[in-house]
């Protein structure tokens, strides 16, 4: 029984990796894709931005719509849509078709990811749920960070089409594994759409949404410009920058493992302490950003904190709305994407007005606001629980 549950969580982790790999893997391929389709750099950027926008829009809607359907069937549907999109991307010579082949699967992205978090949490006891979810988050981190260099390596060694084959192969393998090894998972207690939407009446839900947006803004507002920061402030070479990004990605995975333990044993203390610890890292980065060795150490610590932060955000959202886990995870994914967009926008403003070094300010500002949101969220969450007794 334990082995079957471990296999289920493993399949979910690889499934999330495949989906995030499809989303993020093209980042390193954009110049090659622009050349292949004979479009400008700004136009090819739509392959990334349109995907993120589709995820943000569908996050609160699609998981809700599919919440009453057998979860195995939903997983197979989503994986099938991604495989189809991957296959179209391999063979199309039309950029518009390639764009559609990404946007349509992107709409289903929150469905699979929210299901993966929900099913992983439900496969163990309530106390062990954060640990199971943290394992799925390893797939998120790997897809976001490791997928990019792997796809770039394949494209450089073989061709652009072969990197697309890599995306498809991962999703096909997960589809087959889901078909063969994941048991049927009918929804036993189906919640009405109204019952799930009613969680939006709770102040703690909205404060959790705000917290997730601000936390992701604090992390990705700086990380979005990390390569530029290392190039212009630290004066690193492109090869060294690639190494630093790998360090960050590996540290992210370590952060997921750490989160699984801390969120079980000391969730509230960890959440309240997080803005101070990350804030200290950013302050040190601001004053030592010109030095390569301190930046390498900072990158390692920052990556671990970022990995923990993703798990923490998901925990904050789902613990506020335990009665509607699928909808809560959809809200988490939307809030997280909005946080990335907000942080990157404000970070770009600081860079344009003050210089690359000052992108740290978007992180610090977001952390101050997120700390206030966390305190309010925890107060409302505690108040709501005491009144419901």
Which residues are covered by each model-predicted region?
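Helix-breaking motifs and short loop linkers at transmembrane-helix boundaries and internal kinks
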Residues: 38, 70, 91-97, 235, ...
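C-terminal transmembrane helical hairpin of 12-TM major facilitator-type secondary transporters
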Residues: 269-313
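Conserved MFS/SLC helix-loop-helix module at the cytosolic interface between two early adjacent transmembrane helices
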Residues: 57-93
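Extracytoplasmic
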Residues: 8-41, 59-62, 222-227
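Helix-to-loop junctions at the C-terminal end of transmembrane segments
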Residues: 59-70, 255-267, 351
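Cytoplasmic helix-loop-helix junction between adjacent transmembrane helices
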Residues: 101-139
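Helix-loop-helix hairpin linking two adjacent transmembrane segments in secondary transporters
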Residues: 97, 126-182, 225, 229
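Paired small-residue
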Residues: 85, 96-105, 293-301
């Amino acid at each position: 029984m334990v082995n079957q549950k471990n296999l289920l969580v493993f399949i979910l982790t690889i499934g999330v990796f495949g989906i995030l790999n499809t989303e993020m893997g093209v980042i390193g391929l954009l110049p090659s894709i622009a050349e292949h389709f004979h479009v400008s750099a700004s136009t090819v950027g739509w392959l990334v931005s349109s995907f993120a926008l589709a995820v943000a829009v569908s996050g609160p809607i699609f998981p809700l719509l599919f919440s009453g359907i057998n979860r195995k069937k939903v997983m197979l549907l989503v994986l099938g849509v991604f495989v189809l999109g991957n296959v179209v991307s391999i063979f199309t010579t039309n950029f518009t078709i390639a764009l559609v082949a990404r946007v349509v699967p992107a709409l289903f992205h929150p469905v699979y990811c929210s299901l993966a978090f929900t099913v992983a949490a439900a496969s163990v006891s309530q106390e062990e749920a954060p640990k199971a979810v943290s394992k799925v988050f390893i797939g998120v981190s790997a897809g976001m960070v490791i997928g990019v260099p792997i796809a770039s390596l394949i494209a450089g060694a073989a061709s652009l089409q072969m990197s697309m084959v890599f995306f498809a192969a991962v999703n096909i393998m997960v589809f087959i594994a889901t078909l063969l090894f994941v048991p049927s998972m009918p929804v036993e207690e189906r919640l009405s759409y109204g019952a799930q939407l009613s969680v939006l009446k709770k102040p703690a839900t909205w404060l959790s949404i705000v917290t997730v947006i601000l936390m992701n803004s604090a992390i990705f507002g700086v990380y979005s410009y990390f390569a530029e920061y290392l190039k212009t402030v630290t004066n690193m070479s492109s090869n060294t920058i690639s190494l630093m990004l790998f360090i960050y990605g590996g540290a992210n995975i370590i952060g997921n493992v750490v989160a699984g333990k801390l969120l079980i044993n000391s969730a509230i203390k960890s959440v309240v302490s997080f803005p101070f610890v990350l804030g200290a890292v950013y302050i040190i980065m601001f004053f030592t950003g010109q030095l390569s060795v301190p930046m390498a150490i900072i990158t390692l610590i920052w990556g671990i904190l970022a990995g923990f932060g993703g798990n923490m955000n998901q925990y904050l959202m789902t613990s506020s709305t335990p009665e509607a886990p699928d909808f809560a995870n959809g809200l988490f994914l939307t809030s997280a994407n909005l946080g990335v967009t907000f942080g990157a926008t404000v970070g770009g403003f600081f860079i344009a007005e003050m210089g690359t070094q000052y992108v740290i300010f978007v992180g610090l500002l977001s952390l101050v606001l997120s700390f206030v949101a966390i305190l309010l969220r925890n107060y409302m969450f505690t108040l709501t629980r005491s009144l419901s007794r």
